[in-house]
Swiss-Prot record:
Organism: Nitrobacter hamburgensis (strain DSM 10229 / NCIMB 13809 / X14)
GO MF term (any one): ATP hydrolysis activity
Presence of keyword Zinc: no
Protein task: Produces ATP from ADP in the presence of a proton gradient across the membrane. The catalytic sites are hosted primarily by the beta subunits.
Protein name: ATP synthase subunit beta
Location (main, coarse): membrane
EC number from the UniProt entry: 7.1.2.2
Organism phylogeny: Bacteria, Pseudomonadati, Pseudomonadota, Alphaproteobacteria, Hyphomicrobiales
Residue ranges of coiled coil: none
GO CC annotation terms, alphabetical: plasma membrane; proton-transporting ATP synthase complex
Amino acid sequence: MASPANQTGRITQVIGAVVDVQFEGHLPAILNAIETKNGDNRLVLEVAQHLGESTVRTIAMDTTEGLVRGQEVKDTGNPILVPVGVGTLGRIMNVIGEPVDEQGPVKAEDMRAIHQEAPLYTDQSTEAEILVTGIKVVDLLAPYAKGGKIGLFGGAGVGKTVLIQELINNVAKAHGGYSVFAGVGERTREGNDLYHEFIESGVNKKGGGEGSKCALVYGQMNEPPGARARVALSGLTVAEHFRDQGQDVLFFVDNIFRFTQAGSEVSALLGRIPSAVGYQPTLATDMGALQERITTTTKGSITSIQAIYVPADDLTDPAPATSFAHLDATTTLNRAISEKGIYPAVDPLDSTSRMLSPLIVGEEHYQTARMVQQVLQRYKSLQDIIAILGMDELSEEDKIAVARARKIERFLSQPFFVAEIFTGAPGKFVDLADTIKGFRAICDGKYDHLPEAAFYMVGTIEEAVEKGKKLAAEAA
């Protein structure tokens, strides 16, 4: 329940991003937004704790440099409200819904609180339909569900953001509905690139409005932890509004780990005792509150694709481990694969999807995926023998399996549209039927005569055959 608005209080203490405020009358409710002036800026503080002696402890959504004790603070009577509706499309907003793209105010249909209840069980709906991404390794081995939650796991610099940008390129551009991108604690440069990329490719119009399809909500690396801990909720609120109007929404988050990290930064300042690896004791609760809202209802769907940073490449770290439970499909990026120059560096044996069932994808797709994994697993188990004794000591059967596995490994790579400017190679979108046909043929030994190099960075199997002919002609 909202507390009476316009109650005023005074700042009694400022410790980094945490500010204590004393009120004389009615205390603002937990999660209420209270406001003060910091120079020319409107500074929003969110109530986190009631301390007693009429004092509340709050988390600042912007820098607290310049605040002084005794400064006046007003209670807004509501949680943080952000603009929602088609007026947000093509615009960049910050955590409190203010535009940061210098294109004037956001024309909002409505203002909506960033803290909402998750939909009831009775309102939720599930579909068993595949979202085709055009990326071979994903579509074959860990297919994404429409209206599902997808996690892209990977350490630093293995290609999570490039993969999410390629998914935006392949899925959001072909998708008729609206998309929302929440940039949580990532590089400002990447956010800027994405904004301009959307305008150049026609997904958005400069200045937003008619013809734009994607709303951007950013709280980047340089923002205080309060903003990074809440910006995912602000983006989700925009997406929920579109869903409740009957839209099928795509919701991209880069990066969910930064949401957890920001929570752990403020947790100690709020006086909570840290839990495992120094994370906040409320880690599972915070993650659940966010993830349970990202769901498909009887009105519309949210398909969410989330990049999840893996600290020190350790998937058992509490932050990535907590997010695993909420996902329908996981795409795990592996540094060892990226070191071989195979991009996207998706681990074919470590990526999973509940959609990979013969009842959903069909018998042929399922069998092909399992054959590919079987060949790769066999190669993996033979690697120790190869390292010690060499290829010559393998049986003829094993030699064939290894040769096919190495071809499959290379065929799992493909050039991306968003990487064209770096590589000079045109991007490729591969249909699911072509993907299945290509891998099935390699497993069946139809292309045993082609060299490994023919399968590297191509789209369909026909391109690999062409490349093989070209390589043979050059060698002759």
